[in-house]
Amino acid sequence: MILLDGSAVAKQIREELKEKIKNEPRKPILTVIMVDSEKSGPSQIYVRNKIKAAEEVGIDVSVINIPKTVKEDDLIKFIGAYNERLYLTDGLIVQLPLPDHIDEHKVLNSISPRLDVDGFHAQNAGLTLAGKDCMKPCTAYGIMRLLEAYNIDVTGKKVKIINRSMIVGKPLASLMLNKNATVTVLHSKSLNIKKECRSADIIVTGVGTPNFIKEDYIKKGA
């Protein structure tokens, strides 16, 4: 069994980015919009991690806090100002989740695909599916970069992905297919997940449950 060290690969990528950014005429700017997130909630932790990672490589981060009472149309108009004035930022993230009265799909699709660094816009999702150059969801793309760093060729491999979200499972399935893997997407309604996994060369799980995959789910050499 090979241990894939994601932290080591991430560190290497950050060092490469740091050198690249250092030679640019100006620092890139990342804008993060937060709609009334709890000060100690998960969203704050995610954003703090993003800020830390960005600043380590030389990216300036602007965090904008908006009251939870904001109307959906007003939030979309606010985002539109960044779409129309591309000098304001190089990338835009709307931190999820949003309040119940706001349609996340509408808001995410109001971001210019060029600024959509999360890769959630429908245009970027379609381009990811088609195997074209675009902004890709970070977790899915990170998994591909991790495999690449260890020279793991997925061509012809049976890949089982236990996640069907738009953030991980679906884009990862597209990226794997574009690299000629044979992909099966499993989820909470799938029958006999153990049997499915036993035939896999590569298993990717994103179910958020520790020890979900047991030793006897994995075939020798996977």
Sequence positions of predicted segments:
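Glycine-rich phosphate/diphosphate-binding loop of Rossmann-like nucleotide-binding domains
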Residues: 41-51, 134-221
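Short beta-strand segments enriched in small/hydrophobic residues
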Residues: 27-38
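Non-catalytic terminal and connector segments of soluble metabolic enzymes
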Residues: 56, 84, 111-114
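Short beta-strand elements in bilobed, periplasmic/extracellular small-molecule ligand-binding domains
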Residues: 54-68, 183-185
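Positively charged, low-complexity intrinsically disordered leader regions
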Residues: 1-26
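Short, well-structured alpha-helical segments in soluble
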Residues: 74-87
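Short, Asp-centered acidic motifs that coordinate Mg2+ and/or phosphate
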Residues: 90-91, 202
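Anion-binding alpha/beta catalytic cores of soluble intermediary-metabolism enzymes, centered on
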Residues: 93-154, 172
